[in-house]
UniProtKB/Swiss-Prot annotation:
Metabolic or biological pathway: Pyrimidine metabolism; CTP biosynthesis via de novo pathway; CTP from UDP: step 2/2
Record-linked SUPFAM superfamilies: Class I glutamine amidotransferase-like (SSF52317), P-loop containing nucleoside triphosphate hydrolases (SSF52540)
Cellular component annotations (GO), alphabetically ordered: cytosol
Assigned EC number: 6.3.4.2
Reactions performed catalytically: UTP + L-glutamine + ATP + H2O = CTP + L-glutamate + ADP + phosphate + 2 H(+); L-glutamine + H2O = L-glutamate + NH4(+); UTP + NH4(+) + ATP = CTP + ADP + phosphate + 2 H(+)
The protein's name in its UniProt record: CTP synthase
Organism of this sequence: Polaromonas sp. (strain JS666 / ATCC BAA-500)
InterPro entries per record: Class_I_gatase-like, CTP_synthase, CTP_synthase_N, GATASE, GATase1_CTP_Synthase, P-loop_NTPase
GO MF annotations in UniProt: ATP binding; CTP synthase activity; glutaminase activity; identical protein binding; metal ion binding
Keywords (A to Z) from UniProt: ATP-binding, Glutamine amidotransferase, Ligase, Magnesium, Metal-binding, Nucleotide-binding, Pyrimidine biosynthesis
Lineage: Bacteria, Pseudomonadati, Pseudomonadota, Betaproteobacteria, Burkholderiales
Length: 563
């Protein structure tokens, strides 16, 4: 029978519930348990797909095409279980499902209310995510409840998990509550009052925490832990300190050494072998003992919030570990990059242009791609980063001076990038759209496969077939591929059915490492193996760094104005 651990948060948001949940899952997995994680988001959006990265951060995409919370990226990087659509749901999805049932007459004329109809639906969604009472059932499902205790939006979720705990019994559920213990510099002490109050709020809802994870910028002394225990009704051994660390990969060991996994296993009556965290210790050692350092310039549209590129940042660091190098990322707002100042990128060992939507800042990205191409700096373009590299090549090499994307200029005479109107989805169904289609849920999403051209750089990295996750509406225009090929661009991966361009590159006798991919490889990177594309990119960056050092960092070419 599946056991459930519910993780809630209090006082303030962004305490690290996702990292705490993923860390607990990793420890339990190391004990031999089959574990999954489920994220409940209390906003009314159906999914985060149409939300601004500045508001929500990264949208993480699963193999089955779900646009989900960035915490699912942490989950996949910490445990072996892959996330699915069922592992993340929102208030919007719950109400949509309830209202559809009401319209069908499933409630047999009853008045539809938050209790029991909405709360029952939440419980059904949780069980579905855990594969409850199916062949796919897990041993433990860790359920992260988004938001903060006391928020109106979270109340139906908290009531639902309270009911679920009551129905399933005390040995089948456990509650872990994160709270904030601030350090008041003027007083020179940690203050426990906010944690006392949030534990009280939780009890008023009907939930008694089994474990309190106390977030602070330092370890919490025994005296404060004893006080928190007394006023929160949690035994002192259940009051666990979570302090700031320089890498999130230290958190599993931190929680294990304070007995969190033992407490949960005792509460849930789980008889398991001891935890084995050697792989985590090895990982931390690798992060703390790099042999060299590389500097990457990331030219993006959402750089004011680094969470917009969370998986990408982690993928670069994973590749750094595989190459025994510390990766230092410097962010550049693409709106600030112009032909006059792009030469400031010359001091970097590699240039990366990530994905994005809309015309803002696109010309700066095109400048960055051109600068990398002309100065033979290793370049990796992801999604929009591939598209701007294609536009740049079309303008300055293929002679299509007005080349553009119809996303940025619908009337462009040379639409080398255009809207995809038909494609096969991750589940095999044929999807269509046009310029008037809704924004939400109408992109090419999820895992897609394509053939890789033999003899290409991509083939050295991926082999014969590449399968990666996608999230885009626009694609290289098939009508321009021959012209681009004749000018020297290598189209190294195409989908079999639609002939959509998946990877472009420059021949290695022209540029040592210049690759653009339409997909998002960062979503499949793990700290254990990295990702083959990022591993190859950082290896090329290291090689460029060595060569540039030997050549004395030759002066970069300035960009010439193009009429």
């Amino acid at each position: 029978m599946t056991k459930f651990v519910f993780v809630t948060g209090g006082v303030v948001s962004s305490l690290g519930k996702g990292i705490a949940s993923a860390s607990l899952a990793a420890i339990l997995e190391s004990r031999g348990l089959k574990v999954t994680l489920i994220k409940l988001d209390p906003y009314l959006n159906v999914d985060p797909g149409t939300m601004s990265p500045f508001q929500h951060g990264e949208v993480f995409v699963t193999d089955d095409g779900a646009e989900t919370d960035l915490d699912l990226g942490h989950y996949e990087r910490f445990i072996e279980t892959r996330m699915r659509k069922a592992n993340n749901f929102t208030t919007g999805q719950i109400y949509k499902s309830v209202l559809e049932k009401e319209r069908r007459g499933d409630y047999l004329g009853k008045t539809v209310q938050v209790i029991p109809h909405v709360t029952n639906e939440i419980q059904e969604f949780i069980k579905r995510g855990a594969g409850y009472e199916t062949a796919d059932a897990v041993d433990v499902a860790i359920v992260e409840v988004g938001g903060t205790v006391g928020d109106i939006e979270s109340l139906p979720f908290l009531e639902a998990v309270r009911q679920m705990s009551l129905r399933m019994g005390p040995n089948n559920t456990a509650f872990v509550h994160l709270s904030y213990v601030p350090w008041i510099a003027a007083a020179g002490e940690l203050k426990t009052k906010p944690t006392q109050h949030t534990a009280k709020q939780l009890r008023e809802i009907g939930i008694q925490a089994d474990v309190l994870l106390c977030r602070a910028d330092r370890r919490i002394p025994a005296e404060e832990r004893e006080k928190i225990s007394l006023f929160s009704n949690v035994p002192e051994w259940g009051v666990i300190s979570m302090w700031d660390v320089d890498t999130i990969y230290k958190v599993p060991r931190m929680l294990h050494e304070q007995g969190l996994d033992g407490l949960i296993c005792d509460k849930l009556r789980l008889n398991t072998p001891p935890a084995n965290l050697k792989r985590w210790d090895d990982l931390v050692y690798e992060t703390e003992h790099p042999k060299t350092e590389v500097n990457i310039a990331m030219v993006g549209k959402y750089v004011d919030l680094s969470d917009s590129y969370k998986s990408l940042n982690e993928a670069l660091r994973h590749a750094g570990m595989k190459n025994h190098a510390k990766v230092v990322i410097e962010y550049f707002d693409s709106e600030t990059i112009t032909p006059d100042n792009v030469s400031r990128l010359a001091r970097f060992d590699g240039i990366l242009v990530p994905g994005g939507f809309g015309v803002r800042g696109v010309e700066g990205k095109i400048c960055a791609a051109r600068f990398a191409r002309e100065n033979k700096i290793p370049y990796l373009g992801i999604c929009l980063g591939m598209q701007v590299a294609t536009i740049e090549f079309a303008r300055h090499v293929a002679g299509l001076k007005d080349a553009n994307s119809t996303e940025f200029d619908p009337a462009t005479p040379n639409p080398v990038i255009a809207l995809i109107t038909e494609w096969k989805d991750a589940d095999g169904t044929i999807k269509t759209r046009d310029a008037k289609s809704d924004l939400g849920g109408t992109m090419r999403l999820g895992a897609q496969s394509s053939d890789v051209a033999k003899g290409s750089l991509a083939h050295k990295i991926y082999g014969d077939v590449v399968t990666e996750r996608h999230r885009h509406r626009y694609e290289a225009n098939v009508n321009y591929l021959d012209a681009l090929r004749k000018s020297g661009l290598v189209i190294s991966a195409l989908t079999q059915r639609e002939h959509l361009t998946e990877i472009v590159e420059l021949p290695q006798d022209v540029h040592p490492w210049f690759v653009g991919v339409q997909f998002h490889p960062e979503f499949k990177s793990t700290p254990w193996a990295g990702h083959p594309l990022f591993n190859a990119y950082i290896a090329a960056v290291l090689e460029h760094r060595v060569k540039a050092g030997q050549d004395g960092k030759a002066t970069a070419k300035a960009l010439k104005a193009v009429a």
